[in-house]
Swiss-Prot record:
Family stated for the protein in its record: Belongs to the universal ribosomal protein uL1 family.
Function, as annotated: Binds directly to 23S rRNA. The L1 stalk is quite mobile in the ribosome, and is involved in E site tRNA release. Protein L1 is also a translational repressor protein, it controls the translation of the L11 operon by binding to its mRNA.
Protein name from the UniProt record: Large ribosomal subunit protein uL1
Keywords from the named record: Repressor, Ribonucleoprotein, Ribosomal protein, RNA-binding, rRNA-binding, Translation regulation, tRNA-binding
Organism of provenance: Sinorhizobium medicae (strain WSM419)
Length: 232
């Protein structure tokens, strides 16, 4: 515990909590401070000027990060027949219909992302209380209810990241690993930020992107100047 506390304290040295850093400087500093014995996840958080309690201020979507996430994603697909075969051929880890629903209802969730064909949704709908709180319920708005199961599986395994604003108006995601080079992390952060900006809801008024911060699993958070994150 003492070693961990010492490492955390050291990682905060030279960090000005009041400063707005440029993206390039922030990424460099975060990488330098990611000194844990595992490959730390780099996460970006955006505080938005929305109130998600109102339907016209909900922010959600999916973005394909250009350099992937650096993590292995297990994908489950609810499908039958030819579509089930397509999912398996595309690399899905778990494929099934009624039997898969029973497995999930029994509490076994051995996957990170869930895809379904439209005809399966009446069946998958029974899993709302199980998958919903985990953010894994298939949804056509983010491409996880689709007939193109092969494309969805490949996207999920290739760096697709879903995002959804939380109650406090914050949207966040893991966008890579500390082992990524700085350019790859910057490109991923910009891709994520642009997707969130493009998902601006009609009900959002005033300043949409209020604050942006980047951090590693065990490192400090650095505030970023929002003007430096957009690729547009």
């Amino acid at each position: 515990m003492a070693k961990i506390a010492k490492r955390v304290q050291k990682s905060r040295e030279g960090v000005d909590p009041a400063k707005l850093y440029g993206l390039t400087e922030a990424v460099t500093m975060i990488k330098e401070r990611a000194t844990a014995k595992f490959d730390e996840t780099i996460e970006v958080a955006m505080n938005l000027g929305v109130d998600p309690r109102h339907a016209d201020q909900m922010v959600r979507g999916v973005v394909n990060l250009p350099n992937g996430t650096g993590r292995s994603v297990r994908v489950a697909v609810f499908a039958r027949g030819a579509k089930a075969d397509e999912a398996k051929a595309a690399g899905a880890d778990v494929v099934g219909a009624e039997e898969l629903v029973e497995i999930v209802q029994g509490g076994k969730i051995d996957f990170d992302r869930c895809i379904a064909t439209p005809d399966m949704m009446p069946l998958v709908g029974r899993l709302g209380k199980v998958l919903g709180p985990r953010g894994m319920m298939p949804n056509p708005k983010v491409g996880t209810v689709t007939m193109d199961v092969a494309g969805a599986v490949k996207a999920s395994k290739g760096g697709a990241v879903e995002f959804r604003v939380e109650k406090a108006g914050i949207v966040h995601a893991g966008i890579g690993k500390a082992s990524f080079d700085a350019k790859a992390l910057e490109e991923n952060i910009r891709a994520f930020a642009d997707a969130v900006i493009k998902a601006k809801p009609t009900g959002a008024k005033g300043n949409y992107v209020k604050r942006v911060a980047v951090s590693s699993t065990m490192g400090p958070g650095l505030k970023i100047d929002p003007a430096t994150i957009s690729a547009a």
